[in-house]
Amino acid sequence: MRRRIALPRACWTLAVSKGTKEDILRTYPDIRPERVHVIYNGIDLDEYQKTSDTTALTKYGVDPALPYVLFVGRITRQKGVTHLVQAIRYLPPATQVVLCAGAPDTPEIAVEMRQKVEEARALNPKVVWIEKMVTKPEVIQLYSNARVFCCPSIYEPFGIINLEAMACRAPVVASATGGIVEVVVDGVTGHLVPFDQDQTTTLPSNPDKFAHDLADKISDLMGDPEKARRFGEAGRKRVEERFAWSAIADQTIELYHRLITSPHT
């Protein structure tokens, strides 16, 4: 209720992506488009840098000598991790898959996740499930040593997780939804995987096809280390050019200055 009252009355509204701006305007049609401004989230480029350290991999049972595809995130419908687990059956045999996934938001998805992982492990013993959210230095190691980072989210207003992976030079395979398409450049910093969304459930209308398509794009990079390296380098460059906190701060200051000097425009 507060949001419904506050947003239409605001002189300016900040959105973290163009997709979020579109969602705001669709939900609140009385808001004038020129009053909604997009300023992306940023990332600390000094903190998120590629490292050759593999101590965290060894700690959590990841084989540093074997390429792997990585997921990092909470176990929720929105984050789509179960779709990646479903995709494991379509990956080349013995592909190492690292699921850094914890904090299920419902008991039902916790049970579903465990069941799907057990089924995946029956087909592929190289599935590593880290059932908690690890420390930042540890997740940087996981990003840095991944052949591919996968973000199978059903929706993301922005998807800062992709910035973190790209800053560590990991190529990204991600669903083409929300703000993700404004971060990941298809065929340059990774692969975008489109899917038809059920308008009632917001889930993929064909989950098996989505899983198969995820696997195809992951397999492309797992099997082509040079392409993966090239995409990873391009990802780091894109983050440096577009998403450094210094640039985001400058944009925010400039917008606030306009708000202060012209509060009713």
Where are these regions (language model features)?
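Membrane-proximal helix-turn-helix segments that form the acceptor-binding/catalytic region
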Residues: 1-13
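Carbohydrate-associated surface elements
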Residues: 19, 42
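A short helix/loop element that forms part of the nucleotide-sugar donor recognition site in Leloir-type
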Residues: 49-62
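A conserved mid-protein helix/loop that constitutes part of the nucleotide-sugar donor-binding site
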Residues: 67-71, 76-90, 111
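Nucleotide-activated donor-binding/catalytic signature segment of Leloir-type glycosyltransferases, i.e.
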Residues: 110-133, 137
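Short alpha-helical donor nucleotide-sugar binding micro-motif in glycosyltransferases
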Residues: 141-146
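Aromatic "clamp/platform" in nucleotide-sugar-dependent glycosyltransferases that forms part
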Residues: 154
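Short hydrophobic beta-strand element within catalytic cores of glycosyltransferases
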Residues: 171-174, 184, 191
